[in-house]
């Protein structure tokens, strides 16, 4: 169901365009340690996800397919792991229920059908969760613990929060200290526990060690700034003092969970008292799993930066602790209501069928990416001449069909710099937003092009200069051109 329509999908938002573009640029320029976006360093994420897209692009020859394969694989692995853990912790029936609950949840499709990094992160979180549960609740199993540690390391170089499964040690330590049944005690194993940290660091070093060596030996100011950005600003500083997606502390509980964790949230009025009873009976399995879910939610709640997909890593733990209660819930609801039971089965089948059908309907309905249409028209109007981009988004770079020039995605005074650049490049064009056109150019000499989701755009050349802008850039512009047709 997660893979329905995968061959029809294409990048549809800036995140998908960005990650696919970075992966394709890696294939083109051969720089695997430092990601680039239109020749400018992309500092926001480590490169493991982009490596994976590049690998699948090389294997399949289909970038639009390669973009969505990591999340699809993550969905398959997560479903299989949930089934196996449910079977081992309780029985085969509970394993099936856990897998179905995961596949029934709205957020599963919202995340795993997108070509974004959070679907790929789910793979490492689930492997970390699986290894920790096998060790802490079904162990001792040191091999699985080290698998979990390696997965967390790879999760960290995918997206910084890949360490989340380690939070399971907190409720586990409490359960061990209080003597709760259902958890495995492993006294006198301090060295083995610390070895897990070494395994996680070794996984991180797969990327970080070559990066540091490269920057130390051959790096310039930009690459050194990248190391500082990715290790400090994009991790601890972004968590403690987020500058994007700022939301109040109640955001996840009032705006995200009621919608994106459907239909699971509908059962919470019965589940919460049942969990309380299980905890009163000192069930260590429930304490560790439910405690981990609460800690993950708390972790993201404490950060001022919040997006709806951030809490997705908690979902596998939630369905695993819910699954044993589902048979009891179904008996409670439908034992004396055979007609209601038939309605419930019908609704469940419709729910799964609707998500499967939507996988094919959405890509057909969305059809061509608006920025792809924009850049195709621009290439035709300019006859493939050099193009200066201003206030651009990733789709304009990804779908460019001609050489592009820019002063940096977040540079100041981009329109003014474009006007100055055109004076020394009279055969080139610049793509200017409508609301900034009159600042530096004569509107009557500008040509309007296809609108995209970012608004109206106009093409100008040096003859449209109104002489009002004199903002010379202190640095040379970035230049980039796709060497081969890629999409």
Residue ranges and their predicted role:
Residues 8-24, 31-34, 40-52, 62-65, ...:
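Extracytoplasmic catalytic/substrate-binding loops of multi-pass membrane glycan-assembly enzymes
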Residues 81, 121-138, 318-321:
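Specific aromatic-rich, kink-prone transmembrane helix
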Residues 82-104:
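Transmembrane-helix signature of polytopic, membrane-embedded enzymes
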Residues 88-89, 93, 128-145, 326:
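Membrane-interface transmembrane helices that cradle and orient dolichyl/undecaprenyl
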